[in-house]
Every structure is written in C-alpha cells, then in structure tokens.
Amino acid sequence: MLEGEKRTGYLALRPDHAPLGFAEICIREYANGCTAQPVPFLEGIWIDPKHRRHGVGRALVESITGDLIEQGFHELCSDADIRNRRSHQVHQNWGFAETERVVYFRKVL
C-alpha cells in the first residue's frame, strides 16, 4: 500500500517482486450513486494481461475493502465507461452493484 493525502495505491506483486497489477483509490467528497460522504472511490485498477482471471484483481479489491472497513467506511464506489461491458461484469464479480447511469456534457469555450 502506498499512501498519499487522499489517495492510496495498492500493488500486487509476484514473489520475485515483479508487478502483477495495481489499484488506486481516493477519498471523494461526492460520487454519483453513493450514499455516504466522503466516499472512497476506485479510481483505477490494472492487471497484467498474462495474470487476468487468476484472482489478482479480486485480491486487490478485497485488500482495499478490508482497509476501508477498518477505517470506518461503509461503501466503495467505482465507475466504468458505459460501453465497457467487460468492466461492468468484472465489477459485478467483485461485489459492486450498478447504481445509475450518467451522461456527461462539455462546452468548448
């Protein structure tokens, strides 16, 4: 675990210390679909393609979850691109439930 002010990074390493994957969470003041404020948010997670579907991502999420429970949090939130169905399925496999869908807008100035 690597900690910053409101960000924490998690590394999954092989026995020889080569990286298998990483995840980053931050504490947000608000996140769509979440009930608590502030709320921990899974900003990103990446697993080496050779090690996907072997429990590395689940282990990272479980480690994060345990730490957050110890800190008194009651939920972990995340997001995924609306077209990324693979990510939706992985999130569900890790115990996340979809809360809402949002369309973002931008105006060029």
Each model region followed by its residue ranges:
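Glycine-rich acetyl-CoA-binding "A-motif" of GNAT/NAT acetyltransferases
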Residues: 15-21, 86, 99
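Conserved GNAT acetyl-CoA-binding A-motif
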Residues: 61, 68-80
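Conserved acetyl-CoA binding element of GNAT-fold acetyltransferases
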Residues: 36-49, 103
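Active-site rim helix/loop that mediates acceptor-substrate recognition in acyltransferases
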Residues: 1-14
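Conserved acetyl-CoA-binding loop-helix of GNAT-fold acetyltransferases
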Residues: 43, 47, 53-66, 89-93
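Conserved acetyl-CoA-binding loop of GNAT-fold acetyltransferases
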Residues: 92-101
